[in-house]
UniProtKB/Swiss-Prot annotation:
It comes from the Bacteria. Homodimer. Zn(2+) binds at residues 33, 81, 90, 93, 96, 101. GO terms for biological process: negative regulation of DNA-templated transcription; negative regulation of siderophore biosynthetic process. Fur acts as a repressor, employing Fe(2+) as a cofactor to bind the operator of the iron transport operon. InterPro entries: FUR (IPR002481), Fur_C (IPR043135), WH-like_DNA-bd_sf (IPR036388), WH_DNA-bd_sf (IPR036390). This is Ferric uptake regulation protein. Fe cation binds at residues 87, 89, 108, 125. Belongs to the Fur family. It is found in: Cytoplasm. GO terms for molecular function: DNA-binding transcription activator activity; DNA-binding transcription repressor activity; sequence-specific DNA binding; transcription cis-regulatory region binding; zinc ion binding. Residues 85-142 are annotated as: Dimerization.
């Protein structure tokens, strides 16, 4: 927990119990790409008494401080993930809503080439690919979007 205390201090935020609890939940492997509402439900399941308004406020503070990255996927709901992860892009299934993270060196290099062709030096980028399940089997099937090769 002291690492989280230091992370909050390094980000210029006061260490409070709600911030610590929210950060702990965000660090759980099953809490990547989590909405404020789902994070709130997770906190309730853990017996934490943190209001939904506080969850929204803390997530906005974390976003401003660079602790989390906010994504606006199809459907209008914001989801959050810790910013400490390596760069990756996202593939979103419009049928089931699953968000798949991927990295591809060829795509990364091509984006740099395109920017250079327009005399722009990239500082950051986001790539979101949207699609539908190839065979319609994804709803209720946790293995539907496993990488095939």
């Amino acid at each position: 927990m002291s690492d989280n205390n230091q992370a909050l201090k390094d980000a210029g935020l006061k260490v409070t119990l709600p911030r610590l609890k929210i950060l702990e939940v965000l660090q759980q492997p099953d809490c990547q790409h989590i909405s404020a509402e789902d994070l709130y439900k997770k906190l309730i399941d853990l017996g934490e008494e943190i209001g939904l308004a506080t969850v929204y406020r803390v997530l906005n503070q974390f976003d401003d401080a660079g602790i989390v990255t906010r994504h606006h996927f199809e459907g209008g709901k914001s989801v959050f993930e810790l910013s400490t992860q390596h760069h990756h892009d996202h593939l979103v299934c419009l049928d089931c809503g699953e968000v798949i993270e991927f990295s591809d060196d060829i795509i990364e290099e091509r984006q740099k080439e395109i920017a250079a062709a327009y005399n722009v030096q990239l500082t950051n980028h986001s790539l979101y690919l949207y699609g539908k399940c190839g065979d319609g089997s994804c709803k209720g099937n946790p293995d539907a979007h496993k990488r095939k090769n």
